[in-house]
Regions:
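A short, hydrophobic C-terminal helix/tail in secreted or cell-surface proteins
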Residues: 207-211
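Alpha-helical transmembrane segments in inner-membrane proteins
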Residues: 1-206
Length: 211
């Protein structure tokens, strides 16, 4: 489809402004913290100085956490775009039609039951996949309409939210806290290994969004 020159210019300015904001926030994240670091030393350590006194703080703690935050946001945006394109509704996203809640149910159940946290990513993926299949089946009536799918998804989302609440009320508080922390999300412990994983996910979701 064709886009007018004025809209193209706005998109260019929007992308440029976003990149500038990301760079500024990235630099601020490297400098500011419980242990403030001079801007020149922080930038040098992040880009080329691997033997300085700030190497561990910058390259093992702050830098990977910032990059993980950026990539996670990009993955969320890509997943939202995919859903909106598939359902042809600009208001739809994984959190609205219950996919996020489906992922959270199994993950929260594992945490609350004291299960192995190594299974969390797989449990969340399985929960999201099963929820998507359930929503699709419940929406089927001589085909699937976008409106019916959205309405069913909203209902399933509410139901799964109630299940999560039940789990958090039923189990001991120390386990529930871990589940609540997982739902809220945290950058604590983020590493370059997480960056590689998110890059793979981003490449996949970006390719799917383009299609």
């Amino acid at each position: 489809y064709k886009v007018s020159g004025r809209i193209q210019l706005k998109i260019v300015w929007l992308v440029a402004g976003t990149l500038v904001a990301i760079i500024i926030l990235l630099g601020t994240g490297l400098i500011v913290g419980d242990y403030p670091i001079p801007a020149s030393r922080a930038i040098a350590t992040a880009l080329w100085d691997r033997n300085g006194e700030y190497d561990f703080i910058i390259n093992s703690l702050r830098f990977p956490r910032i990059v993980v935050a950026i990539l996670a946001g990009m993955c969320f945006a890509s997943s939202g775009l995919i859903f909106q394109s598939l359902i042809n509704n600009p208001l739809v996203s994984p959190d609205v039609i219950g996919i996020n809640s489906g992922a959270a149910v199994l993950a929260v159940a594992i945490l609350a039951a004291g299960g192995n946290i190594g299974y969390l990513p797989w449990a969340a993926f399985l929960g999201a996949l099963l929820t998507a299949g359930l929503i699709y089946l419940l929406s089927w009536k001589r085909g699937v309409s976008a409106t019916r799918l959205v309405l069913v998804g909203i209902g399933v989302n509410s139901l799964l939210g109630a299940v999560i609440t039940f789990i958090t009320v039923k189990y001991p508080i120390e386990r529930v806290i871990a589940a609540a922390r997982w739902q809220a999300g945290t950058l604590f412990g983020a590493s370059w290994g997480d960056v590689r994983t998110l890059l793979i996910c981003l490449l996949y979701t970006s390719d799917a969004a383009d299609e």
